[in-house]
């Protein structure tokens, strides 16, 4: 039974996520009768308890609630496509199926917005909804706010793309959907988006690549969806040509990557299919969460966005401390390096050391996901200080304390009981310097690892001479210089 439920939810995911693009396409005047028919029939069948394709009753923390958001936004913005054509029975069934989100517990995170959007949609078509749970969800979202536009994703302490493509994105949707009924919050969410934009722009390099950091990177070009939401909401935290440039360059960069399979279907991975870095909640339809960036298609033909020139990156600071994002960002020669403090919940979704606790994340270098902790090269601890103990590799999982300064990041951490490390990362004109103070109760080997250079790339070579190690290919080069100063115990 459980396997069948998971299969149904995987299919629902692949059905609902394209709506993030199709609904704006319809709102903007696009027409595709075949797709309209597919979605009307699908909604009717999936929400009919008597139909063999019924999506089923939901439970606690159900993945179905994630997929309800796209359907709810469709009802809010294109009811003539997804609501009005349904029979009276079909409308009752759809409302009842969506309403299940009010009868169960959902995670204390960005999922609160799914309940908010569903209740707004039900209210908009005169169906039963919960004003109490709507307000409760909004209060929880407000409680996540940290500062400078950043929020936590609920109880999770890490800051990642779930802030721009979830918390901020849905907040901007709410600011339009609820402008008349909740003007105070609508204005507040727009103000926070203004602040956030001044920070988030630092995550994009001059070529259009965005920072590879955090979980759910298989959503790929959803990286630019925050800018799309700003433009759709009529908000200009940056000049419109600058935001268009960010979006266009990011899309162009992604179109240059190997993200499609032979049939033109988005794969799970990042720049190419890669299952090591996949999340446990990923299914074949997961990458289509990136369709949220196509909110731009809802803009009318005469919107200034379509005629604006795509402007280059604005003038930005060389070093940008982001204390509310737990990182220091460096801009150098058009590229971005983020020095992360290693702040994360330390468990939950898996591979958090790789996705949050490396010392540096860079738009020109991808980061590695570990295959095994028993062999150094399979542990792939790029941009980490790796300790080998009893033939096992240990790295930073999470920092105990940290400090973000104007020119450095300092963190205290422990890879293994009996080993305490204080690491200070200082950006320089040509890269960065790492200073590690290690207090170990026993002998062990430690490897300070640089960025990952693909050894299958043209021109790859590596060398080690005295205290200098280098790896390079035709397009990337990483050089590491090692200085040691032993301080034996008294």
What kind of feature is each model-predicted range?
Residues 140, 248, 451-454:
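Amphipathic alpha-helical scaffolding segments
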Residues 11-25, 32, 36-228:
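Aromatic-lined, polymer-binding surfaces characteristic
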Residues 3-10, 483-488:
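Conserved small/polar residues in nucleotide/adenosyl-binding loops
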Residues 1-5, 12, 16, 26-37, ...:
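Terminal-appendage/accessory-domain detector
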Residues 50-55, 94, 205-212, 217-348:
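Carbohydrate-active enzyme catalytic cores, enriched for enzymes
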Residues 12, 65, 284, 322, ...:
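Solvent-exposed loop and beta-edge segments used for protein-protein assembly and interaction
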């Amino acid at each position: 039974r459980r396997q069948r439920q998971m299969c149904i939810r995987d299919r629902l995911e692949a059905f609902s996520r394209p709506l993030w693009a199709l609904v704006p396409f319809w709102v903007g005047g696009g027409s595709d009768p075949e797709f309209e028919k597919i979605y009307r029939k699908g909604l009717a069948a999936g929400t009919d308890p008597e139909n063999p394709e019924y999506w089923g009753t939901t439970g606690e923390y159900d993945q179905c609630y994630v997929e309800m958001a796209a359907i709810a936004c469709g009802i809010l913005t294109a009811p003539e496509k997804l609501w009005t054509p349904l029979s009276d029975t079909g409308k009752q069934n759809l409302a009842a199926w969506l309403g299940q989100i009010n009868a169960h517990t959902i995670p204390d995170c960005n999922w609160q917005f799914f309940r908010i959007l569903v209740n707004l949609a039900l209210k908009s078509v005169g169906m039963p909804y919960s004003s109490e749970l709507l307000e409760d969800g909004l209060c929880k979202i407000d409680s996540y706010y940290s500062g400078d536009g950043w929020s936590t994703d609920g109880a999770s302490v890490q800051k990642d793309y779930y802030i721009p493509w979830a918390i901020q994105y849905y907040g901007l949707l709410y600011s339009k959907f609820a402008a008349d009924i909740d003007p105070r919050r609508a204005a507040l969410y727009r103000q926070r988006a203004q602040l956030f934009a001044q920070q988030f722009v630092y995550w994009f390099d001059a070529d259009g690549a965005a920072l590879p950091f955090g979980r759910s990177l298989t959503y790929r070009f959803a990286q630019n969806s925050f800018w799309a939401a700003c433009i759709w909401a009529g908000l200009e935290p940056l000049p419109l040509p600058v935001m268009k440039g960010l979006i266009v360059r990011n899309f162009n960069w992604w179109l240059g990557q190997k993200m499609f399979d032979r049939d033109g279907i988005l794969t799970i991975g990042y720049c190419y299919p890669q299952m090591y870095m996949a999340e446990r909640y990923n299914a074949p339809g997961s990458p289509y969460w990136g369709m949220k960036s196509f909110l731009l298609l809802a803009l009318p033909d005469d919107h200034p966005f379509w005629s604006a020139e795509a402007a280059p990156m604005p003038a930005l600071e060389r070093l940008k401390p982001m204390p509310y994002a737990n990182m220091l960002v460096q801009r150098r020669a058009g590229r971005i390096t983020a020095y992360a403090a290693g702040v994360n919940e330390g468990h939950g979704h898996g591979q958090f050391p790789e996705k949050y606790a490396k010392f540096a994340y860079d738009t020109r270098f991808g980061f590695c996901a570990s295959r095994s902790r028993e062999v150094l090269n399979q542990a792939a601890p790029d941009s980490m200080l790796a300790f080998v103990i009893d033939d096992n590799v240990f790295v930073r999982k999470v920092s105990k304390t940290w400090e973000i300064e104007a020119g450095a990041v300092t963190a205290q951490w422990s890879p293994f009981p009996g080993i305490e490390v204080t690491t200070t990362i200082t950006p320089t004109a040509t890269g960065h310097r790492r200073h590690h103070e290690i207090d170990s109760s026993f002998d062990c080997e430690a490897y300070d690892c640089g960025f990952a250079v693909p050894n299958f790339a043209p021109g790859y070579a590596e060398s080690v001479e005295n205290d200098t190690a280098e790896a390079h290919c035709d397009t990337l080069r990483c050089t590491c210089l090692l200085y040691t100063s032993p301080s034996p115990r008294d």
